[in-house]
């Protein structure tokens, strides 16, 4: 079995699928399913559709962390609202770096929010859109006009951050980013390194 569509059914769990290692795509949208882990480590699995199910962000992040090559499509309406609210220059940056079309499909939107690397342009002033990129690992904000790192607070997968030549002065939003391994704050306005104490 390669494709399974159980959309709109009364199915509540996926435990009976755990041995189906040839599954490529599963659609469980509009169901009461909350747990994706029975699909964990299926080597051929590439997409899971779970809009309007009980699958939440915490479950999705856990599953993606364990299965980085699987695209999990969920909460698409909220994602589309976020995308439509972005300024056009942010859309250009994200579609260019995620290598998607300028009018991304729902699959491409989910690819965008799961990018691992991002470098922003020098004229960018607001980092808020980055807060949605919770799987990002390498972020380069150098030479930008960004002066506030607050949107980075929840980016727990961040490993490398470059804010060289910016007006950043406060590192407090980085204090809980336990995976951060590299930080470049050359030519910034940072005075205190105290927020880095427990990293």
PLM features: what roles do these ranges have?
Residues 5-8, 27-30, 51-52, 75, ...:
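Per-repeat beta-strand-to-loop junction in leucine-rich repeat
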Residues 3, 16, 21, 38-140, ...:
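N-terminal capping/linker segments that flank leucine-rich repeat
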């Amino acid at each position: 079995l390669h494709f399974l569509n159980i959309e709109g059914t009364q199915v509540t769990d996926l435990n009976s699928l755990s041995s189906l290692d040839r599954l490529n795509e599963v659609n469980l949208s509009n169901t009461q399913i909350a747990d994706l882990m029975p699909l964990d480590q299926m080597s051929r699995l590439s997409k899971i559709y779970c809009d309007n199910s009980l699958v939440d962000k915490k479950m999705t992040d856990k599953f993606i962390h364990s299965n980085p090559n699987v695209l999990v499509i969920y909460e698409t309406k909220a994602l589309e609202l976020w995308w439509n609210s972005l300024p056009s220059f942010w859309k250009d940056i994200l579609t260019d770096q995620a290598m998607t079309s300028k009018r991304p499909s729902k699959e491409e939107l989910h690819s965008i929010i799961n990018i691992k690397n991002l470098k922003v342009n020098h004229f960018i002033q607001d980092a808020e859109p980055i807060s949605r990129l919770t799987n990002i690992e390498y972020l380069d904000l150098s030479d930008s006009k960004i002066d506030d790192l607050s949107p980075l607070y929840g980016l727990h997968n961040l490993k490398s951050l470059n804010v060289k030549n910016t007006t950043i002065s406060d590192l407090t939003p980085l204090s809980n980013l336990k995976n951060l391994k590299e930080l470049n704050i050359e030519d910034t306005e940072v005075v205190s390194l105290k927020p880095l104490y427990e990293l």
